[in-house]
Amino acid sequence: MMKRMVILRRCEPPPPQPAAAVVAAMGGCCGRVRYGECRRNHAARMGGHAVDGCREFLAEGEEGTGGALRCAACGCHRSFHRRVVVVQQCCACDTAAAAAAAGGWEWRDCSPESSSSASSTTAS
């Protein structure tokens, strides 16, 4: 007797990427992804746990090539390395999109000259 296998697909959109969700939640802050130490378990077949000493992902090739996803230090794929999102604070006055995302708030000039002139006008 043959068994039948039914494959179900979800109609929902895929969940957002974690890095994009963090950047969106921070209100327009800039985020950069860095890959840390390698977490590949080389002794998984034997039931043990052994990792190599690779401390940071170094791409073998340029961005857009196959070598960009392979580590030059340990030879592992980039997905074996720990993903770290480095959040950087961006000046909201640099982009019009950030002002629109803030709900119409007006942003002051962030340059040091304008802040010093604004403080001198309020002091007099």
UniProtKB/Swiss-Prot annotation:
<dbReference type="GO" id="GO:0006355">
    <property type="term" value="P:regulation of DNA-templated transcription"/>
</dbReference>
<protein>
    <recommendedName>
        <fullName>Mini zinc finger protein 4</fullName>
    </recommendedName>
</protein>
<dbReference type="GO" id="GO:0005737">
    <property type="term" value="C:cytoplasm"/>
</dbReference>
<dbReference type="Pfam" id="PF04770">
    <property type="entry name" value="ZF-HD_dimer"/>
</dbReference>
<dbReference type="GO" id="GO:0005634">
    <property type="term" value="C:nucleus"/>
</dbReference>
<keyword id="KW-0863">Zinc-finger</keyword>
<keyword id="KW-0479">Metal-binding</keyword>
<dbReference type="InterPro" id="IPR006456">
    <property type="entry name" value="ZF_HD_homeobox_Cys/His_dimer"/>
</dbReference>
<comment type="function">
    <text>Inhibits zinc finger homeodomain (ZHD) transcription factors, by interacting with them to prevent both their nuclear localization and their DNA-binding properties.</text>
</comment>
<comment type="subunit">
    <text>Homo- and heterodimers.</text>
</comment>
<keyword id="KW-0963">Cytoplasm</keyword>
<keyword id="KW-0862">Zinc</keyword>
<dbReference type="GO" id="GO:0008270">
    <property type="term" value="F:zinc ion binding"/>
</dbReference>
<feature type="zinc finger region" description="ZF-HD dimerization-type; degenerate">
    <location>
        <begin position="35"/>
        <end position="84"/>
    </location>
</feature>
<dbReference type="GO" id="GO:0000976">
    <property type="term" value="F:transcription cis-regulatory region binding"/>
</dbReference>
<dbReference type="GO" id="GO:0003700">
    <property type="term" value="F:DNA-binding transcription factor activity"/>
</dbReference>
